[in-house]
Amino acid sequence: MPVKIALIGAGSRSFGPSTIRDVLLSKPLVEAGVHLVLMDKVAEHLVDVERYARYAAEKLGVKVTIEATTDLQRALDGARFAVCAIDVNRFLYWSQDFHIPRKYGFRQVFGENGGPGGLFHALRNMAPTVEIARTMERLCPDAWLINFSNPEHKLCEAVSRLTSIRVVGLCHGYFMGLAQIAHILGIPTEEIEATACGINHFTWFQTIRHKRTGDDLYPLLREREREGDWLAEWHEYGLARILFRRFGLWPSPAPNHYGEYIRWADEFVCSELQFFYDPADGHPWQTGRIPEFVYSLTGDPTRRPWKPEPPQPWRPEDAPLKPSGEFAAPIMESIACGVRHSLPAVNVPNRGAIPNLPDETVVEVPAIGDAEG
């Protein structure tokens, strides 16, 4: 019987095509048979994504069943996996999460996952996420929910506490932190083996070793950090270096992420998210309009051309047919096909993995995926 995979929020131009590619490029899943259901609440969002899925399947020469629907129950009925990436009017509410706390003196780095803004972001996304999980309890109680939505660990914890559905959350922040370490050490990331744990968007590298020699790279990292100019690439490394010198471990993924969980971080992080509006024309929470914003993970966040080029029409066919590097497909390969995978970072209930955190708390830790889960 084919493996039914429901992509919830498939109309997203980042999540939908990349996850579709990963599924179609998975030889174990394709050989097992795939029934891929693209689900989004907005029908027009599905048009391009469904077209892309059929294009990619034909281009790759794989035979899978593809359908698109706006009906959540139809998508989940009999599913083996639900892969979810949703948000509620993201940028309008993010601008509110960012500015309203600042109005009352809460200086946030991002306002996405931590602090007052992160709390309201979580409360907005919890209701639809738990609704998805409760629908799964009725229609596919043995299925796994693979979540990409933020705030990652808060949503996964809501599902694990309030429903019986097995849930795992995924984030690529681990690789951002690994890239920082590789840059400082001058060693390619593929030659580094590192273990990190903590909560989503705030983990600590417990071990950093050279894959070939097995050498502990922390002594070299400390040496290279001390040698570096204190203000070099401050936006990217400043807060990390402060924490590293104080606690002896390198934090991950980046200051603009874990800075959300540190009250004083705003004093040491050059904000890489800025919403711009003229208050004389009304605040975004009054007008309902999304203000202009700049958002950057690296470099100068406010550097924009004087006369921006008009946006080009989105063509999903232009995306190369190669894996995204996310772990949803490997997890599905493990559970549905018994392929053993080593996963450097997943968000799951703690259950003793980190002894000084409660068992029911969702933590980000490395894991092994196999037929047992």
Predicted regions and their residues:
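Redox-cofactor binding/interface segments in oxidoreductases and associated redox assembly factors
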Residues: D77, V83-C84, N147
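Short acidic low-complexity segments
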Residues: T65-G78
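N-terminal Rossmann-like dinucleotide-binding module
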Residues: I5-V30, L36
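A short helix-to-beta-strand connector/capping loop
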Residues: A57-E67, E190
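NAD(P)-binding Rossmann-fold cofactor-contacting core
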Residues: L29-A56
